[in-house]
C-alpha cells in the first residue's frame, strides 16, 4: 500500500510539474510572439471572403494581383472579372447555398470562379483535376452541384477513361470548360500556333479536346455584365467551400467550411506574419494547389488579404519557378519540403 501510495503521489507530483512546465513554456512562447509583433488574439471575422478582394481592389487598384506565366492582372481588373463571373453564375441559376464544382489547376480562372461564387453566397466544391475518374464521380454525387467548371484536359481525360460525360457523373449538369492558354501573354498564345514540336507539346500540356455539349466558361464570363455592387453579401456563418480529405484512411470525405472558418485561417496566418510582411508590397508564389486547404488558405486567401501579387503556376516545376523568379522574385513562398 505504501509503495502504491508513493507511486500515485509521484505520478501526481510529476503531472503537476509537467503542467507547471507547460504553463511556463506557454508564457515564454507568448512573450516571444509578442516581441515579434504577433498578437495573442485577433478580432472575430465580420465580413465574408469576397470582402478581402473588395478591400484590396479599393486600396491597391493598380497593383498586379495575378502573374500567370508572365501575363498580369491588376486588382481592379480582377475585381471586374469576378463581378462578371458572379453575374454569369447567377445567369446559370446559381444562388445562395448552391454548389459550383471547380476542377482546375492553379490559374487565373480558378481565382475568379472562387471569388465570384463566394460573392453571391455559392459554395465552391474543389476537385483535384488529376484525380481518378471514379473518385471525381463519387465527389460529384456527394455535393450534387448543378454547375461544373473544369479544365479542358480533365474533361478530355474523363471521357477517355469512362467513355462519356454521363459515365463520368456529369450527365444532366451544366458543364463548362476552361482554356488555360486564354490567360497567357499574347506572345505565348501566338507561339502555341506554330507548327513545331515544342509548340505542339506545350499545347497538349495546356489544352484538351472539349467533349460535345460542353460550353466555354471563358466566353460566358467575358460576355457577362458585372454583378450589381449592391448585391447582398452572404453571412460569415454560411458555407463557402467543400474540400476533400486526402483519403489516407479511406474514401476522401467532403469537409464543409464557412466563410468564417476560411477567413479566420487567413487572418490568423496574416497575424503570424505581420512582423515581416507589408500590405500591398508582397509577392506570393501560388504553387500549392488551390484545391488543397494549404494552398487555398495561404495563396488564394492570404495573398489577397495582403493585396499581394500572386505568381500563379499551374503545377510545381523547378524550371517554372526559376523562370518566374527571374521575372518576379518571391517575398513569400508557401510550400512543402520537397519543393
Go through each PLM region and give its residues.
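A short helix-loop-beta submotif of the ANL/AMP-binding
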Residues: 86, 99, 105-125, 129-133, ...
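Conserved AMP-binding/adenylation subdomain of ANL enzymes
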Residues: 263-283, 291-334
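Structural core segment of the AMP-binding/adenylate-forming
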Residues: 2-17, 21, 91-92, 119-219
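Conserved structural elements of the adenylate-forming
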Residues: 79-84, 224-227, 255-276, 287, ...
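Conserved AMP-binding A3 loop
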Residues: 74-76, 240-267
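Conserved pre-ATP/AMP-binding loop-to-beta segment of ANL
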Residues: 194-244, 251, 276-283
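Adenylate-forming
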Residues: 105, 150-160, 178-184, 288, ...
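Conserved AMP-binding/adenylate-forming core of the ANL superfamily
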Residues: 43-45, 54, 62-93, 98-107, ...
Amino acid at each position: 500500500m505504501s509503495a502504491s501510495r508513493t507511486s500515485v503521489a509521484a505520478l501526481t507530483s510529476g503531472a503537476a510539474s509537467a503542467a507547471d512546465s507547460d504553463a511556463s513554456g506557454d508564457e515564454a512562447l507568448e512573450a516571444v510572439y509578442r516581441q515579434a509583433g504577433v498578437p495573442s488574439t485577433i478580432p472575430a471575422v465580420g465580413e465574408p471572403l469576397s470582402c478581402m478582394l473588395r478591400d484590396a481592389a479599393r486600396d491597391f487598384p493598380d497593383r498586379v494581383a495575378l502573374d500567370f506565366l508572365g501575363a498580369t492582372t491588376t486588382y481592379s481588373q480582377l475585381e471586374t472579372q469576378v463581378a462578371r463571373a458572379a453575374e454569369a453564375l447567377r445567369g446559370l441559376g446559381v444562388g445562395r447555398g448552391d454548389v459550383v464544382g471547380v476542377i482546375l489547376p492553379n490559374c487565373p480562372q480558378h481565382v475568379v470562379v472562387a471569388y465570384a461564387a463566394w460573392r453571391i453566397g455559392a459554395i465552391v466544391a474543389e476537385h483535384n483535376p488529376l484525380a481518378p475518374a471514379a473518385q471525381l464521380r463519387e465527389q460529384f454525387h456527394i455535393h450534387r452541384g448543378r454547375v461544373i467548371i473544369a479544365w479542358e484536359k480533365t474533361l478530355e481525360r474523363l471521357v477517355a477513361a469512362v467513355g462519356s460525360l454521363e459515365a463520368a457523373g456529369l450527365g444532366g449538369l451544366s458543364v463548362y470548360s476552361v482554356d488555360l492558354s486564354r490567360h497567357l501573354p499574347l506572345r505565348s498564345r501566338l507561339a502555341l500556333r506554330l507548327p513545331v514540336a515544342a509548340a505542339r507539346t506545350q499545347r497538349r500540356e495546356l489544352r484538351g479536346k472539349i467533349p460535345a455539349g460542353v460550353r466555354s466558361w471563358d466566353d460566358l464570363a467575358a460576355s457577362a455584365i458585372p454583378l450589381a455592387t449592391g448585391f447582398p453579401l452572404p453571412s460569415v456563418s454560411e458555407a463557402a467551400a467543400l474540400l476533400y480529405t486526402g483519403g489516407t484512411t479511406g474514401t476522401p470525405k467532403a469537409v464543409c467550411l464557412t466563410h468564417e472558418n476560411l477567413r479566420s485561417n487567413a487572418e490568423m496566418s496574416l497575424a503570424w506574419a505581420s512582423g515581416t510582411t507589408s500590405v500591398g508590397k508582397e509577392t506570393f508564389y501560388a504553387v500549392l494547389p488551390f484545391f488543397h486547404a494549404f494552398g487555398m488558405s495561404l495563396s488564394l486567401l492570404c495573398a489577397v488579404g495582403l493585396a499581394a501579387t500572386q505568381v500563379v503556376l499551374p503545377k510545381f516545376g523547378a524550371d517554372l519557378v526559376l523562370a518566374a523568379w527571374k521575372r518576379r522574385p518571391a517575398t513569400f513562398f508557401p510550400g512543402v519540403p520537397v519543393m
